[in-house]
Amino acid sequence: MLDLKRIRNNSNEIKEALNNRGEKFDVTVIDEVLKLDEERRNILVKVEVLKSKRNKVSSEVPKLKKEGKDVSNIVAEMKNLSEEIKGFDVTLAKIDEKIQYIMLRIPNIPNPQVPDGETDEDNIEIRNWLEPTKFDFEPKAHWDIGTNLNILDFERAGKVTGSRFTFYKGLGARLERAVISYFLDTHTEKHDYTEILPPYMVNRTSMIGTGQLPKFEEDAFKISEDDYFLIPTAEVPVTNLYRDEILKGDELPLKHVAYSACFRSEAGSAGRDTRGLVRQHQFNKVELVKFTKPEQSYEELEKLTNDAETVLKELGIPYRVVRICKGDLGFTAALKYDLEVWMPSYNRYVEISSCSNFEDFQARRANIRYKEDAKAKPQYVHTLNGSGVAIGRTVAAILENYQSEDGSVTIPEVLRPYMGGREVIK
């Protein structure tokens, strides 16, 4: 959520920034917010005048009573003033509700570093690691490799649940588990993140706090009876861990890593990478989340991105880092990098991680603040997160980049201790 004071003082700048985003945003709502804000402030002035008058009249009552004078008219005036104030309070509550409704639907403002552009084709490659994998045979897609090795079963998952679900079997299940353990060990032991094992369901307030709601409700799986939601990412519960709290400045940055299953309806993605493990309704992911002081956040974003890159380097998977343009930025981020791995069967790079700085956008929605010391005024933290990284897509990238002509798959060296010393799946 944006700072209302910022909108008030820089409305034209805010409108221009929102106009440059990819999704067509109706900037006239900024004028609507400003109109409501002005109305609210005018009413507050009137309320203060009425309260001052009521207090003045009220202070006269004891003196007049002591003098034996009739105070019925003054009491009646006080009652009228109180009723008038109460009426204004009702009006203010309605205005606040309207302002909140609009503010929750205004996207974040892109950081000046974000490049211009309208679609993902305008994203800018920052760096890459390893050349795309080449083969002297026609490489197979990971869903064919996994099916042939009997380690992935899409057909039976379709029978049991539906499309875009998967059974991992035998060494496939062990490979998935190995990747999860390797990622968690790397981020906790080498990168100094504190591990969190979060709930897989959250309430509506939590989804609003991180920006999934109200805009993306159609993409969420809702448990309707209790107004709970299956988490689309561990970012939601881990960020909301500190909702409505004031953190200590000397504790920042706070760094958490969380493994979780993730659940997404992927509304509107029909026909896009729907085969295999790339776009599933349920998938596993290791998430990195940081809470920082504002002046630290962009330095910490670079570190977080590097932490996510480390596991891809150690796995030996070719990847690149792209800076996301304004048109592809998404609702909540101020600046975002995507890590994309090379997928031979696609003959292109596929996103495996998004690393974002939300600045104070989520912190305002979730009311997460910090104080430098006991006497200091609370300030909003900056929140950051990134996949560290998506598990299913990592497994897909391993199967495709490490495949052999005979259909076997070499296990990356760093995973072999987690695979009982095995070197090959065949």
UniProtKB/Swiss-Prot annotation:
What GO biological process terms does the UniProt entry carry, in alphabetical order? selenocysteine biosynthetic process; seryl-tRNA aminoacylation
GO terms for cellular component: cytoplasm
Q: Which SUPFAM superfamilies match?
A: Class II aaRS and biotin synthetases, tRNA-binding arm
Which parts of the sequence bind ATP?
R264, S265, E266, E351, I352, S353, S354
| Top-tier EC class | ligase
Q: Which InterPro entries match?
A: aa-tRNA-synt_IIb (IPR002314), aa-tRNA-synth_II (IPR006195), aa-tRNA-synth_II/BPL/LPL (IPR045864), Ser-tRNA-ligase_type_1 (IPR002317), Ser-tRNA-synth_1_N (IPR015866), SerRS_1_N_sf (IPR042103), SerRS_core (IPR033729), tRNA-bd_arm (IPR010978)
Keyword Metal-binding (UniProt):
no
Catalytic activity of the protein = tRNA(Ser) + L-serine + ATP = L-seryl-tRNA(Ser) + AMP + diphosphate + H(+); tRNA(Sec) + L-serine + ATP = L-seryl-tRNA(Sec) + AMP + diphosphate + H(+)
The record's domain comment reads: Consists of two distinct domains, a catalytic core and a N-terminal extension that is involved in tRNA binding.
Q: How does it assemble?
A: Homodimer. The tRNA molecule binds across the dimer.
Name of the protein this chain belongs to: Serine--tRNA ligase
